[in-house]
Amino acid sequence: MGLIDFVKEAGEKLFGRGEAQAKMAEVKSDPDNAAKIAAANGAAGDAILDYVKSQNLSATGLTITFDGAASTVTVYGVAPDQATREKIVLCCGNVTGVAQVKDMMSVDQSEPEAQYYTVVSGDTLSKISKQYYGDPNKYMKIFEANKPMLSNPDRIYPGQKLRIPPA
């Protein structure tokens, strides 16, 4: 899949909690300290990995790294299918502070790739469904394709990137 762009200011706020927050505070106090930068990047990568796992998504050899200077996540591993791969990538990218995800994953079972859509103000899943499928009533297909990251079809936010499965 390569490099996927995300809205850096939108998404889950993972870096403001726990160890990731403490490491980021250390870097801000001494931005020239390479060890502190590496520790902060490691803590951020671990926070994203924990978030992916909290969504009950897994892949063989799943590894997530974060480069704070470039606001880029790199994800490695072998997903069981294309949908899981895409959901893991979305979990990595729909995080405040992440501008890009470098997808280095592969899949056990090859399937057609979904399209991606970035939510803008005023969007609903019905509106997006009408745009992609010509039928606003197919919004549940988009909702199901983005579970477990979406828990309610009415809870999407500007800047969020969604999977749009093939029609």
Describe each model-derived feature in a short phrase.
Residues C91, V95-P112, M140-A167:
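Extracellular LysM carbohydrate-binding repeats and other cell-envelope/extracellular binding modules
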Residues M1-V107, R155:
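Secretory N-termini
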Residues D67-T74, A79, D108-P136, M140:
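Primarily a LysM-type cell-wall glycan-binding module
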Residues A38, V119, Y132, M149-L150:
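A generic helix-loop boundary/linker signal
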